[in-house]
Design a protein with these regions (language model features):
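Inward-facing hydrophobic residues that define packing positions of alpha-helical scaffold repeats
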Residues: 33, 49, 56, 63, ...
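Bacterial N-terminal signal peptides that target proteins for export
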Residues: 1-4
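Amphipathic, heptad-repeat alpha-helical segments
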Residues: 17-56, 96-99
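Short, charge-rich amphipathic alpha-helical segments embedded
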Residues: 73, 79-96
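Amphipathic, hydrophobic secondary-structure cores in small proteins
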Residues: 44, 58, 68-70
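C-terminal motif of bacterial Sec signal peptides marking the signal peptidase cleavage site
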Residues: 11-14
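Helix-capping and short linker residues that terminate individual alpha-solenoid repeat units
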Residues: 34-37, 41, 64, 83-84, ...
Length: 99
């Protein structure tokens, strides 16, 4: 999935300046999303996880539709929600003795 998005981004960057394509936002959101997933946020912080997942999927759709400004904003929102979900999950796991 990651390589597919990067291929699309690289192929479209020839048509659009690289400043408009939110590659950094995508990369940071993806890393935060994976970290939250690894922290078992879906179990320990489901509402935050759901927000991160929804923002991430909507950002992917916007990116595919070349709405790069919207995609960048949504990737940032997804990253923030995923980071909160990861932190909340780690705290909840620790409190539950599952760490």
């Amino acid at each position: 999935m990651l390589s597919g998005f990067l291929a699309v981004a690289l192929s479209t960057s020839a048509c659009v300046t690289s400043a408009q394509v939110p590659l950094e936002e995508y990369t940071l959101a993806r890393a935060a999303y994976e970290a939250a997933k690894d922290a078992d946020a879906i179990r320990y912080a489901p509402s935050l996880w759901y927000t991160a997942e929804e923002n991430y999927r909507e950002a992917q759709r916007a990116f595919k539709e070349r709405r790069y400004g919207r995609a960048g904003d949504l990737f940032e929102d997804a990253r923030e929600a995923a980071e909160k979900a990861e932190n909340a999950a780690r705290i909840a796991r620790h409190q539950a003795g599952d760490s």
